[in-house]
From Swiss-Prot:
Protein source organism: Epiphyas postvittana (Light brown apple moth)
Role: Present in the aqueous fluid surrounding olfactory sensory dendrites and are thought to aid in the capture and transport of hydrophobic odorants into and through this fluid.
Record SMART domains: PhBP
One Pfam family recorded for the sequence: PBP_GOBP
Covalent S-S links between cysteines: C39-C74, C70-C128, C117-C137
The keyword DNA-binding belongs to this UniProt entry's keyword annotation: no
Keywords: Disulfide bond, Olfaction, Sensory transduction, Signal, Transport
The organism's taxonomic lineage, starting at the top: Eukaryota, Metazoa, Ecdysozoa, Arthropoda, Hexapoda
Family: Belongs to the PBP/GOBP family.
UniProt name for this protein: General odorant-binding protein 2
Length: 161
């Protein structure tokens, strides 16, 4: 009976952690997305793709447009999240995610997922093409890990940023 309760406590604690990380991810997404308009022209992102980008976490949003990779690269550079070679700057990404309420619960997992998604595409020379593939991989892996936010969560925190 004691082991049953121990399992229940672990499951409940784990479910709160997943919910907490998804909530933190909603803050990260909302804040990061604020740089999109600044990067729209620079990246050649069409108005249609710009409007779709707000639905990044929806299952039916396809992360495939090269211009989206350019926009993500531009946005990442606004927050110093990339190194000169257009790969994630691990320390800066940790600090960025930790800057949000309860960000420390998400930071390591997010950096790990992005880093693992960078590896298979490392040989792609076109930075925008590589970044969009990494973003697509990250979206899938974040959903699998249970840290992807619901669109409603993002909308709820948008006004803070």
């Amino acid at each position: 009976m004691a082991s049953y309760w121990a399992v229940c406590v672990v499951l409940v604690a784990g479910s709160h952690l997943v919910a907490g990380t998804a909530e933190v991810m909603s803050h990260v997404t909302a804040h990061f997305g604020k740089a999109l308009e600044q990067c729209r022209e620079e990246s050649g992102l069409s108005t249609a793709v710009l409007e779709e980008f707000q639905h990044f976490w929806r299952d039916d949003f396809e992360v495939v447009h090269r211009e989206l990779g350019c926009a993500i690269l531009c946005m990442s550079n606004k927050f110093s999240l990339m190194q000169d070679d257009a790969r994630m700057h691990h320390e800066n990404m940790h600090d960025y995610v930790k800057s949000f309420p309860q960000g420390e619960v998400l930071s390591a997992k997010m950096v790990e997922l992005i880093h693992n998604c960078e590896k298979p595409y490392d040989d792609i020379k076109d930075d925008c093409e590589r970044v969009v593939k990494v973003a697509a991989c990250f979206k899938v892996d974040a959903k699998k890990a249970g840290i992807a936010p619901e669109v409603a969560m993002i909308e709820a925190v948008m006004e803070k940023y």
